[in-house]
């Protein structure tokens, strides 16, 4: 059970497989942080495709899958939306997600995904 001072983020990964090898890795399996702390969720990917899309989703305890962002491989701009920010680094094949000033409402399973 979560208390008001504890946020738990469970990390999972999704890999959309095509005829070319693709892989998404989220090494962190579970993260616990104190409320109001910042937390960064790491996502590293591998693909041979030159054009691809990266996604972040979250699934809160209520069960619905919530779309957060889609990033095109040709658009390496970072993005900030409220307390959420995404850092896309094509050179290191990473697409990390940061929650600033975490809140109990942020408790969820977070998914990073890759698609052609």
From Swiss-Prot:
SMART domains: IGv
GO molecular function: MHC protein binding; peptide antigen binding
Ranges where the Ig-like domain occurs: 22-116
Keyword Cell membrane listed: yes
Keyword Ubl conjugation applies: no
Pfam families recorded: V-set
Signal peptide: 1-21
One CC-aspect GO term: plasma membrane
Subcellular location: Cell membrane
Keywords of the record: Adaptive immunity, Cell membrane, Disulfide bond, Glycoprotein, Immunity, Immunoglobulin domain, Membrane, Receptor, Signal, T cell receptor
Disulfide topology: 43-112
Glycosylated position list: 96
GO BP, one annotated term: immune response
Principal place of residence: membrane
Subunit and partners: Alpha-beta TR is a heterodimer composed of an alpha and beta chain; disulfide-linked. The alpha-beta TR is associated with the transmembrane signaling CD3 coreceptor proteins to form the TR-CD3 (TcR or TCR). The assembly of alpha-beta TR heterodimers with CD3 occurs in the endoplasmic reticulum where a single alpha-beta TR heterodimer associates with one CD3D-CD3E heterodimer, one CD3G-CD3E heterodimer and one CD247 homodimer forming a stable octameric structure. CD3D-CD3E and CD3G-CD3E heterodimers preferentially associate with TR alpha and TR beta chains, respectively.
Role, per record: V region of the variable domain of T cell receptor (TR) alpha chain that participates in the antigen recognition. Alpha-beta T cell receptors are antigen specific receptors which are essential to the immune response and are present on the cell surface of T lymphocytes. Recognize peptide-major histocompatibility (MH) (pMH) complexes that are displayed by antigen presenting cells (APC), a prerequisite for efficient T cell adaptive immunity against pathogens.
PANTHER family: IG-LIKE DOMAIN-CONTAINING PROTEIN (PTHR19367:SF45), T-CELL RECEPTOR ALPHA CHAIN V REGION (PTHR19367)
Protein name: T cell receptor alpha variable 19
UniProt organism field: Homo sapiens
């Amino acid at each position: 059970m979560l208390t008001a001072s504890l946020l738990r983020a469970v990390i999972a990964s999704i890999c959309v497989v095509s005829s070319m090898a693709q892989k998404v890795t989220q090494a962190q399996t579970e993260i616990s942080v104190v409320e109001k702390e910042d937390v960064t969720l790491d996502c590293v990917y591998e693909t041979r495709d030159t054009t691809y899309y990266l996604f972040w989703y979250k699934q809160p305890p209520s069960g619905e899958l919530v779309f957060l962002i889609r990033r095109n491989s040709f658009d390496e701009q970072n993005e900030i939306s409220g307390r959420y920010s995404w850092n896309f680094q094509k050179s290191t094949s990473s697409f990390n997600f940061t929650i600033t000033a975490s809140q109990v409402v942020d408790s969820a399973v977070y998914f990073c995904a890759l698609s052609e």
